[in-house]
Regions:
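Core segments of transmembrane alpha-helices
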Residues: 57-72
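Long, highly hydrophobic alpha-helical transmembrane signal-anchor segments
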Residues: 1-21
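Interfacial loop-to-transmembrane junctions
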Residues: 96-120
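Cytosolic, membrane-interface loops and tails of multi-pass inner-membrane proteins
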Residues: 22-53
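Juxtamembrane boundary at the C-terminal end of a transmembrane helix
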Residues: 123-132
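Alpha-helical transmembrane segments of multipass membrane proteins
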Residues: 71-75, 98-99, 125-126
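Structural signature of hydrophobic alpha-helical transmembrane segments
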Residues: 80-91
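Transmembrane helix-loop junctions in multipass membrane proteins, especially transporters and channels
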Residues: 24-31, 79, 106, 130
């Protein structure tokens, strides 16, 4: 279970580093005033930066429930092939969501990836509630 969790951590750091790089580049080039980043007010960042910021924020919402599930599975030694398949499926769908969000950003496609990932997360929690 640690490997799917680690993969999601890597995705989160990847998006976070891209966001930091975009903010630095936008401030350095003058596209966004550096003072904007103090309170996130007073300027309008480019759409590409907004997408990165929203995606980074998304990675601290529902995935928190995934990390809790993973920690319980590890602590109780409950990992099974089915649980690992659900976990990897969840991580894969979060990756798909990120690729769509930061790429062509079609809302319906992004929502379907979000919905499917949350269905797997709910399945993990239902299984966990059943076995505990």
């Amino acid at each position: 279970m640690i490997y799917p969790m680690f993969a999601l951590v890597l995705l989160t750091f990847f998006v976070g580093i891209r966001l930091g790089s975009a903010r630095f580049a936008n401030a350095r080039s003058g596209r966004v005033k550096g003072s904007y980043y103090r309170l996130m007010q007073g300027d309008v960042p480019p759409d590409s930066e907004v997408k990165l910021a929203r995606n980074f924020s998304n990675l601290f919402e529902a995935p928190v429930l995934f990390y809790v599930t993973g920690a319980i599975v590890i602590a109780k030694n409950l990992a099974t092939p089915a649980v690992l398949a659900l976990a990897w499926g969840y991580v894969a769908l979060r990756l798909v969501h990120t690729v769509i969000h930061l790429g062509y950003n079609h809302p319906i496609h992004r929502f379907l990836a979000f919905l499917a990932s949350n269905a797997l997360l709910l399945a993990l929690w239902c299984w966990l509630a059943y076995v505990l």
